[in-house]
Amino acid sequence: MKKKIAIIGAGIAGLTLANLIKKYTDHEFMVYEREESLSLEEGYGIQLAINSIKILNQISFDKISNEKIFHPKTIDFYNIQNEKICDLNLSKFNSTEAKYTTLQRSTLIEFLKEDIYTQYLRFGKKIKEVSELKDKVLIKFDDNTNDLVDFVVAADGIF
């Protein structure tokens, strides 16, 4: 039976879930983001461990240009006096299907929003109230709109 899912938050977790639902199910879904747009500033880098890469590869992350990602071989650890404590050989965790990866957060968000951006994403949707009804969940937003869904996934770090 087809269900209706509300995903709260258009960050990495929310957009990843939206892509997976779109690819593997016929459920109806919508991503609600409280901000007016996605932050795509070049900004900071993130690290993705092997298990997260395996999940992302299910939605074609492995097609991202190698110019936009980096596969470090080791990570060095330092104490507060800037003295090296040890290093970790990351290549030992890599496999043919997934490698430890670093990239800019904006690159990952750009990739994740490609297939869902206009049709499945609503901006400026600040939640005012969530009410559990008999067999549904009612979400009320600050803009006086609402949505009645079967499931709510909180993927917003400030929810």
PLM regions: where:
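Active-site flanking residues adjacent to catalytic metal/cofactor-binding acidic residues
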Residues: 8, 32-33, 155-156
